[in-house]
């Protein structure tokens, strides 16, 4: 055999093996051959990995659907289905589908609620945290959300007074940075009993520890989270590559793997601080970590330190850049759409007492136009833009979706960005920002069912109630107390990791007197 490899025929043998490596998966799934695929997507996962690495997977997949139709094969086993009629079939209760091996790339420390693929394990984990996020339970969180937004307002008032341009009256800032500081401090408060301190210091930083006993170091948490999301989503296209990623010549992977470790270290540091005996003895708050400590593992025992930290990490990730990205997108779309901010001023001034700076949730939760603005931003921006992959497990009967039959081992997804901008669903103005489309008198049942910013079914976002409360209070505060001017040209640029995030939003900001025209 060695002689053959070293002979002139060795190169041909190697080439033949390489061809077979990519051809066999294609031949094995003959039932998928009639589904069109861009480039080499039908033969190799590397096509999708490359699109994800470039940070615009959602655009490439959307363009593929515009070219080929509702069914597009984006990997040898993976079919993207741009059909709102497929949402319940893919993500709904009772279909038996599992999260695909894409989620293996997101595992750090220990499998958590987000990345576990086992149905029984997910049920156990979700039971531990779901009651924490009920509408009844989140009422006790509001005071901590409120306190952080008050500090946010204090800092913006300070900048409005000390950094204003004497000619325009506006202070210049990157709004995304401040929404990041706010979101991280809120989730720090809710999950670990204390904020990170980003708002107070006006910068991105967090303590991290490799182990509970190791000395602390400090990292930029927002940057770490962004890099982790990008590399994990990329490696999710080829999970077997993860153990070797840091050895690849592209520094994107090396830096990304370091970010995965750093983000885990942030969770280790926060859990370590929260579990210190003196903190435990004096703690009277029911934060998310306290709820997690009440949970049981698969043996009925209290969660071990590793699993507890992994679940805390899940909450940190889920509750930070999702809120900041959406808040930034709301400001951007409201600023670029004439008349929206003026309507917000009117409804907010009417609903909130003049002597109140930061409204309570009760003051803003029933303002229709404010809710419409938030929903419309979630539709047109789609923070979670990619199709979340689900695998048909072994033993499952064949399933027909959108006119095509899929078999065990196949992976399917519904791309939310494409669904949320479909003119067939939303009408000819689908790519325009129109809050009024959410008026119940105008909204159709089909549109309501096609709106999936938090996904749907048993793996839907468990923290939806908290997220919606945060966004209502943040937006109710920001648009009522401040005026803005756009200080950047062109559209707001975004980059996609696991989430689609803005790259910045440069604006001018000044105080507004509530009640003024």
Swiss-Prot record:
Signal peptide: none annotated. One of its GO terms (biological process) is benzoate catabolic process. Disruption phenotype: Leads to reduced growth on benzoic acid. Growth is also reduced on benzaldehyde, benzyl alcohol, and cinnamic acid. Glycans are attached at residues 282, 325. It is found in: Membrane. GO terms for molecular function: benzoate 4-monooxygenase activity; heme binding; iron ion binding. Keywords: Glycoprotein, Heme, Iron, Membrane, Metal-binding, Monooxygenase, Oxidoreductase, Transmembrane, Transmembrane helix. It is a single-pass membrane protein. GO terms for cellular component: intracellular membrane-bounded organelle; membrane. Induction: Expression is induced in the presence of caffeic acid, p-coumaric acid, p-hydroxybenzoic acid, protocatechuic acid, and benzoic acid. The keyword Oxidoreductase applies. Its EC number is 1.14.14.92. It comes from the Eukaryota. This is Benzoate 4-monooxygenase bphA.
């Amino acid at each position: 055999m060695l002689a053959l490899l070293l002979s002139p025929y060795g190169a041909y043998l190697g080439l033949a093996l390489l061809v077979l490596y990519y051809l066999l998966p294609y031949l094995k799934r003959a039932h998928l051959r009639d589904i069109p695929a861009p480039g080499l997507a039908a033969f190799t996962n590397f096509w999708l990995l490359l699109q994800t690495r470039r940070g615009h997977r959602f655009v490439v997949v959307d363009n593929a659907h515009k070219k080929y139709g509702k069914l597009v094969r984006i990997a040898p086993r993976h079919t993207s289905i741009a059909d709102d009629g497929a949402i319940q079939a893919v993500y709904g209760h009772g279909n038996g589908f599992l999260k695909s091996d894409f989620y293996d790339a997101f595992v750090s420390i220990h499998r958590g609620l987000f990345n576990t693929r086992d149905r029984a394990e997910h049920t156990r984990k979700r039971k531990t945290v779901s009651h924490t996020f009920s509408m009844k339970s989140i009422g006790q969180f509001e005071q901590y959300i409120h306190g952080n937004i008050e500090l946010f307002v204090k800092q913006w008032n300070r900048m409005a007074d000390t950094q204003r341009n004497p000619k325009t009256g506006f202070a210049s800032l990157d709004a995304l940075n401040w929404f990041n500081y706010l979101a991280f401090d809120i989730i720090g408060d809710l999950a670990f009993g204390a904020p990170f301190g980003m708002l107070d210091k006006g910068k991105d930083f967090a303590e991290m520890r490799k182990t509970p006993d190791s000395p602390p170091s400090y990292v930029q948490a927002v940057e770490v989270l962004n890099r982790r999301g990008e590399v994990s989503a990329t490696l999710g296209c080829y999970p077997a590559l993860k153990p070797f990623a840091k050895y690849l010549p592209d520094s994107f992977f090396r830096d990304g793997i370091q970010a995965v470790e750093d983000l885990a270290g942030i969770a280790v540091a926060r859990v370590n601080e929260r579990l210190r005996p003196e903190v435990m003895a004096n703690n009277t708050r029911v934060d998310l970590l306290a709820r997690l400590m009440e949970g049981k593992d698969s043996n009925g025992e209290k969660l071990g330190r590793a699993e507890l930290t992994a679940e805390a990490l899940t909450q940190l990730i889920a509750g930070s850049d999702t809120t900041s990205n959406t808040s930034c997108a709301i400001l951007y779309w409201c600023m670029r759409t004439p008349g929206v901010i003026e309507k917000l001023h009117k409804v907010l001034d009417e609903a909130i007492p003049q002597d109140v700076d930061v409204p309570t949730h009760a003051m803003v939760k029933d303002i229709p136009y404010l809710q419409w603005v938030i929903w419309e931003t979630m539709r047109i921006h789609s923070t979670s833009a990619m199709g979340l992959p689900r695998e048909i497990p072994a033993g499952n009967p064949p399933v027909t979706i959108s006119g095509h039959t899929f078999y065990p081992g196949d992976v399917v997804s519904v791309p939310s960005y494409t669904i949320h901008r479909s003119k067939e669903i939303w009408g000819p103005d689908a790519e325009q920002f129109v809050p009024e489309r959410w008026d119940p008198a105008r909204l159709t049942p089909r549109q309501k069912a096609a709106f999936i910013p938090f996904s749907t079914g048993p793996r839907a976002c468990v923290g939806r109630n908290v997220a919606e409360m945060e966004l209502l209070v943040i937006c109710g505060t920001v648009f009522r107390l401040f005026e803005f001017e756009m200080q950047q040209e062109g559209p707001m640029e975004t980059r996609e990791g696991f989430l689609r995030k803005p790259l910045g939003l440069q604006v001018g900001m000044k105080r507004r007197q509530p009640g003024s025209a």
